[in-house]
């Protein structure tokens, strides 16, 4: 069955969702160490934790190798996260961190694949998912649907592919009030140099 991802940059660059998965399976361990070394996960945790109860229940969309789980635990989060990712290799690495309770292999944009998680989370987080790979306007509504009223969402976007006025408009339409914005540069390495803007927002009660 055709996936919405097939029409995004993922589909254009790799030909299919299966090819995207294969690419991330191939460089998973290298990616894990490169992203941790960039300092971006620690920056996300510093920006997010002031808005969270340490016992909050959260979900990590596009969790990859679990770098955000590690960073949030280091910053004082007590609870294990749930996580979703397309790559089995990445999910295996995330499991090894010991920071995740449940891990699900799923395509975020495929109807029904993420239905195993209840829409009751205190917070959700995503970094590296929205931007060049998955357009924010496709991903953000799915992510917001997993949150309870009043929950916190931390989401990073690649600014070069995400118009700020359009992102802010969609955030408001989804009931998100932006609380903070942090710039997170990623130096060139396994990935080309890029700049993430990390937003912390609260979903209307």
Where are these regions (language model features)?
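Class I SAM-dependent methyltransferase SAM/SAH-binding core
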Residues: 65-112
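A short acidic, Gly/Pro-enriched loop at the edge of an enzyme's catalytic core
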Residues: 114-124
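A short glycine-rich, Lys/Arg-flanked "PGG" loop and its adjoining helix->strand segment in the class I
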Residues: 137-149
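Core SAM-dependent methyltransferase catalytic element
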Residues: 189-205
């Amino acid at each position: 069955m055709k996936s919405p991802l097939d029409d995004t940059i993922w589909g254009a660059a790799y030909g299919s969702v299966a090819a995207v998965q294969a690419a991330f399976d191939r460089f998973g361990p290298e990616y894990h160490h490169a992203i941790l070394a960039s300092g971006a996960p620690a920056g996300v945790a510093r920006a997010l934790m002031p808005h969270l109860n340490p016992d909050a229940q959260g979900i990590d969309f596009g969790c990859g190798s679990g770098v955000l789980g590690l960073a949030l635990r280091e910053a004082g989060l007590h609870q294990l996260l749930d996580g979703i990712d397309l790559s089995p290799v990445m999910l295996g690495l995330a499991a090894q961190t010991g920071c995740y309770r449940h891990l699900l292999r799923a395509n975020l944009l495929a109807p029904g694949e993420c239905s195993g998680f209840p829409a009751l989370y205190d917070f959700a987080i995503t970094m590296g998912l929205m931007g060049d790979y998955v357009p924010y306007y496709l991903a953000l509504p799915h992510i917001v649907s997993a949150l309870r009223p009043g929950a916190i969402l931390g989401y990073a976007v690649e600014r070069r592919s995400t118009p700020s006025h359009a992102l802010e408009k969609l955030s408001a339409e989804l009931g998100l009030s932006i609380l903070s914005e942090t710039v997170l540069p990623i130096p060139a390495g396994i990935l080309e140099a890029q700049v993430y803007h990390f937003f912390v927002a609260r979903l209307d009660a």
